[in-house]
Amino acid sequence: MNVEVKEYKKIKFIVCFPDNFDKSQKYPLLIKLHGAGGRGDDITLLLRDSAFLKQREKFSSFPFMTIMPLCHENTWFDMWEELTDFIINAITFPNIDSERVYLMGASMGGYATWQMAMSNPELFAAIVPICGGGMYWNALRLVNVPIWAFHGAKDNVVLPRESEIMVERVNNFGGNAKLTIYPENEHNSWDATFSNPEVYEWLLSHKNENASQIIDIYNDIKKYG
């Protein structure tokens, strides 16, 4: 697994390249947002302790370009404009297939995953929020975004109802959301999710066919201001 540490403006981030990476090819992009335990300025902690990276190494083939930004503030929401700008910039990388951009996050990152998709539903082909929750009154904005949420039934940090109500509201509006509850899991529902190959197969089954038009607009904004 080829991993590099980079920085965009104030945000440090990890890039994981797919096996046999070819600069002439375009790859699906998986953006992964960590929980509160990963906050700070030391990106090496995220490298050493990332449950996602440890689980990712178990796969013989992992076709995604993966980007993992580091939250340098108290929460993702305290650097929301920075994070949004970072994600838009990442999506416009030349090796990214803009129709296959996916967002995943756990705990604090799960909340941010819900909110980022509600704020920018046109950017993502599908999302995977894990043990998070969100502003359910804005769920209509997710009606065209496929969602697979995960939560532990015994989670007393973020109650399962947080995921349940989001999924219910999205589906009430005619959306495509599903929820997996791990009956014996407490707050850590991410290890089981990260290690499940069906999650990545499900992500790749979704495409955002309107994304290229959106990316052209963002590229023009970057170029001309």
Model-found features: residue ranges?
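Acidic catalytic loop of the alpha/beta-hydrolase fold
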Residues: 154-159, 188-189
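Short beta-strand/loop motif that positions the catalytic acidic residue
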Residues: 143, 148-151, 155
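Active-site machinery of serine-nucleophile hydrolases
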Residues: 29, 33-83
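Gly/Ser-rich "nucleophile elbow"/oxyanion-hole loop immediately N-terminal to the catalytic nucleophile
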Residues: 20-25, 72-107
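Primarily recognizes the serine-hydrolase "nucleophile elbow" in alpha/beta-hydrolase
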Residues: 88-93, 99-143
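Catalytic histidine-centered segment of alpha/beta-hydrolase-like enzymes
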Residues: 185-193
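A domain-start/cap signature at the N-terminus of enzymes
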Residues: 1-29, 64-65, 106, 111, ...
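Alpha-helical scaffolding within the catalytic cores
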Residues: 45-58, 85, 131-139, 161, ...
